[in-house]
Amino acid sequence: METYRHTYRHHSFSHQDLSDITFTACTFIRCDFRRANLRDATFINCKFIEQGDIEGCHFDVADLRDASFQQCQLAMANFSNANCYGIELRECDLKGANFSRANFANQVSNRMYFCSAFITGCNLSYANMERVCL
């Protein structure tokens, strides 16, 4: 499924299954993606914060495995405790984003795990990476 140039304001995607969906040039203002299934979802040239806002969208505890964000504005977004294994973040504005306790690992046994993320050309100024395993 594909969505193009749609604007969502104060919309709750919480607990929804949005896996494999593609959003292109969409705007998400003060939206809630908490605990949403965004596995293999693709966001291209999307905006997740309105100019002047001090808080972005919430992705807390979301399943972002193999999700792709390309040329997106994700400043001040909250990714705390999200499953980010295999996430792709390319040319995104992530200023002040909160990744505290985000999980970029795939644990295969008690002592062994693999980490995976593709982060290129992103602005991570002031991003919180506290207790992240990457």
Spans of model-derived segments:
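Tandem repeat scaffolds
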Residues: M1-L134
